[in-house]
Amino acid sequence: NSDPQFLADFLSSELGVNVRIHHVHSEMGKIASLESGEAHIGLMTPESSWLGWKQHGLSVMAAVQNYEETTNNFPQAWVRSDSSIALAYLDDDPSTDPISMMEGRASCHTGWLDSIGMLLPMGHLIGNGYVDTDGSSGDIESLRGLIHGFFSNESSIPGHDSPYFGALGAIRCLSEGIGEVAFSTEGIVSESCDNDNPEDDEDWCLGINQYVPISVFDPLPTTSVVYNPSTLDVRSRTAVLNALVSLNYDMYLENYSTAGGTYTGCYDISIHKVDEDSPKGECGSEVLANILDGPGIVRATSQDHIGPFSDSIRHIPGVAEFFQEEV
């Protein structure tokens, strides 16, 4: 049921017009289609949403929620609890700066140019003056030198085949003493090292109290619904947005019994009616779970949703040119 045609059918029903899927092969293809008017809305990653907004005049109308029902994912710097960095973070003394104490320490990143584990943390460090970009070449490859220059030549920037790749790999890198600070996701330590059944924990985990998260970085936004204000007028935009938000009101029920009978179908909680005829995949809850990969969708603006992300990554040398070529 992950066929995007179910989303098109849902919108067709809500809007009373024929909605079709315009197939492209890349995020830049989505941007080009929105610019030309071939497409009217696009589901886009944080990176391509930012590029579309800042470089191509596109705007955000909505955001898909993650499974914590928020529209942001926050990077964390994880350190060992017995480290001087952790002590500086926890001492309530404004004169001690845990971020500056990371200088010269080996760092663990999730991967080359990953937003959570590299771009957002480094954007914060550059934007707040911890890392000096004077003398750098100004292209995206210079970021590697900036990382090694501030942290250490021993910092881990893993490839896909490394055991230290990804959000989990960065924490393993910290746990095994490869690095002294790991840049990863917010819930990764509890998910990997603090399960109800200890046998489900990774075998390299330290005790849960031996990890300290440092939360100072701007968030990574969730998937955006992007449009071109030059080709989608206010009335049409409002209708599309209302239709998308109405996905939240549908719940698919199977053999659900109430005083009035037993039902299987799409239950609209706003009007308390069960649609027993439409395909299951077209029900809002199914579209959200299988196509949009989230529990809900909410109204958003470019500034509110992408702005904090932009505040950090705009400091990365050559990032716009890189996204233009790679997304």
Can you name each region flagged by the protein language model?
Residues 1-50:
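Extracytoplasmic small-molecule ligand-binding "clamshell" domains
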Residues 3, 7, 30, 45-48, ...:
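Stable alpha-helical elements in mature extracytoplasmic
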Residues 8-14, 74, 78-93, 197-294, ...:
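Extended ligand-binding regions for polar small-molecule ligands
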Residues 22-32, 133-172, 176, 187:
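Short helix-initiation/N-cap motifs at beta->coil->alpha
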Residues 39, 106-114, 159-160, 227-229, ...:
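Second-shell loop/turn segments in exported
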Residues 43-57, 127, 167-208:
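A ligand-binding cleft/hinge motif common to bilobed small-molecule-binding domains
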Residues 48-50, 67-68, 83-85, 112-116, ...:
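Solvent-exposed loop/turn segments at secondary-structure junctions
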Residues 62-135:
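A conserved helix-loop-strand patch within extracytoplasmic ligand-binding domains
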